[in-house]
Amino acid sequence: MKMKNKLANEDIDAIQAQCLEKVWEPFPGITIVAWNLPNGFTISDQSGCIDPKSYDREIGVGICREHLRDQLWKLYGFALKEQFGRGDAE
């Protein structure tokens, strides 16, 4: 079976849905989010605020998730290009 030659938002959504997520707040105003990908590889990101009094956990997690999605695009884009370069993609 051949792979397609491009990624779409739906592909990244499907990958993200399969990730296990852990969220930490190691210090006031700091958020760390890690995703364990379907293949077992782990990626992580962190965000922080200037004043811990104005810290909003959901904003911190949201920023990290956006950055992690960007990482998915890069990682899976690279993997697809590798397959495409070998002639395995459509």
Spans of features found by a protein language model:
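Domain-level marker for long, solvent-exposed, non-transmembrane regions
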Residues: 1-90
